[in-house]
Amino acid sequence: MHIFITGIAGFLGANIADYYLKKKFKVSGCDNLVGGSLDNVDKKVNFFKVSCEDLNKMSQILKGVDVVLHAAAYAHEGLSNFSPVSFANNNVVGSVSVFTAAIKNKVKRIVYCSSMARYGNIK
């Protein structure tokens, strides 16, 4: 089974990759390295430095993938007030590009990952 993880250099993506590598899955992934670090990516991962917003590249690299785990997003909720267009492009347009490329390539399953950061601060 070939798993592709977006945001693979971030905390969530890197830990998901480690889990599937231990189960002997083929793991590929992408990250724009804005919030993640290449140091988090295991050497066994086929890594692509690409933004999820790039539909053409996403369509190319998702060929032959069975499952997409979409964990890429800007999670700096406080900063989104200062740069809403950047956040919308990365999080919304990026997600639409990933889903479109996955559908185009007949990926069997898409899993959308989230984190507690989406809920903001506890009041």
What are these regions (language model features)?
Residues 1-123:
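N-terminal Rossmann-like NAD(P)+-binding domain of SDR-like oxidoreductases, especially those catalyzing
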